[in-house]
């Protein structure tokens, strides 16, 4: 049995997230159907994280085990020929049998993109949160840095993840920055791991700070702002 690690990019817009859902098009489901068809039996494809519906990935990491002796580069080409155009395997490699893309990860980086100009191109709109309204971006950048360090992120988890018993909500954020480009605000965060909706809820909280609704910019608020739309979020990288 061979363990194969793949790095893939995808446009999350057409899909219902990463995780298999009966009757719905998901990244994991499509990969398992294709690889399982090549293997001649069901194959479980594990991912480094379960991106939500509409969230994009620049370099998601996944892994699966097969008996097929096909060289990894030929495997990459064969799977890409069968994948929809919105999903592409960037590279594939053989790894140790016990590798797990989620449990072996030591850090992940996400990026959230907000488009700030009044007119957003229709070719950019699917990949940004268009927010042309007034915001104090300096306040937002100050609060972004308060998320660095080890914290209990329970207020920033989705309600179903927030209520999960016995699961720690403590995460370590190594860096949390907000940068301005000519037309965009880009929030970039690198951490040990992330809860469901955590990055999008942090962005919603930064927006509340930009509106002047958060007084203390040097510590985490007791509650998050509204969850920012999924389409502005990108999984950038996973480190091992």
Curated annotation (Swiss-Prot):
Active-site annotation: 52 (nucleophile)
Top-level taxon:
Bacteria
Task: Identify the enzyme class.
Answer: isomerase
Single GO biological process annotation from the record? tRNA pseudouridine synthesis
**Does this UniProt record's set of keywords contain Iron?**
no
Report the EC code(s) recorded for this entry: 5.4.99.12
> Which reaction equations make up its catalytic activity?
uridine(38/39/40) in tRNA = pseudouridine(38/39/40) in tRNA
- SUPFAM superfamilies membership: Pseudouridine synthase
Query: GO: which molecular function terms?
Result: RNA binding; tRNA pseudouridine(38-40) synthase activity
The record lists substrate as bound by 110
This molecule's function is given as:
Formation of pseudouridine at positions 38, 39 and 40 in the anticodon stem and loop of transfer RNAs.
Q: How does it assemble?
A: Homodimer.
Q: Which NCBIfam families match?
A: hisT_truA (TIGR00071)
PANTHER family found in the cross-reference section: PSEUDOURIDYLATE SYNTHASE, TRNA PSEUDOURIDINE SYNTHASE-LIKE 1
Q: Please give the name of this protein.
A: tRNA pseudouridine synthase A
Q: Which organism is it from?
A: Solibacter usitatus (strain Ellin6076)
Report which gene this protein is encoded by: truA
């Amino acid at each position: 049995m061979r363990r194969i690690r793949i790095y893939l990019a995808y446009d999350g817009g057409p899909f219902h997230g990463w995780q298999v859902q009966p009757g719905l098009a998901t990244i994991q489901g499509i990969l398992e159907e294709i690889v399982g068809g090549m293997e001649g039996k069901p194959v479980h494809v594990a991912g480094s994280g379960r991106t939500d519906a509409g969230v994009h990935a620049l370099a998601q990491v996944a892994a699966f085990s097969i008996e097929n002796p096909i060289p990894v580069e030929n495997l990459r080409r064969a799977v890409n020929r069968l994948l929809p155009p919105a999903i592409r395997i960037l590279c594939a490699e053989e790894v140790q049998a016990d590798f797990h893309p989620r449990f072996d990860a030591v850090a992940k980086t996400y990026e959230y993109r907000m488009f700030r100009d009044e007119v957003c191109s229709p070719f950019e709109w699917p990949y940004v949160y268009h927010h042309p309204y007034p915001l104090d971006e300096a306040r937002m950048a100050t609060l972004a840095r308060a998320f660095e360090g080890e914290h209990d992120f329970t207020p920033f988890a989705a309600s179903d993840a927030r209520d999960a018993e016995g699961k720690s909500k403590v995460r370590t954020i190594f860096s949390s920055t907000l940068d301005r480009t000519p037309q965009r605000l880009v929030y970039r965060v690198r951490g040990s791991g992330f809860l469901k909706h955590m990055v999008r809820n942090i962005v919603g909280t930064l927006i509340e700070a930009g509106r002047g609704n958060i007084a203390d910019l040097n510590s985490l608020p007791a509650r998050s702002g509204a969850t920012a739309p999924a389409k502005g979020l990108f999984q950038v990288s996973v480190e091992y």
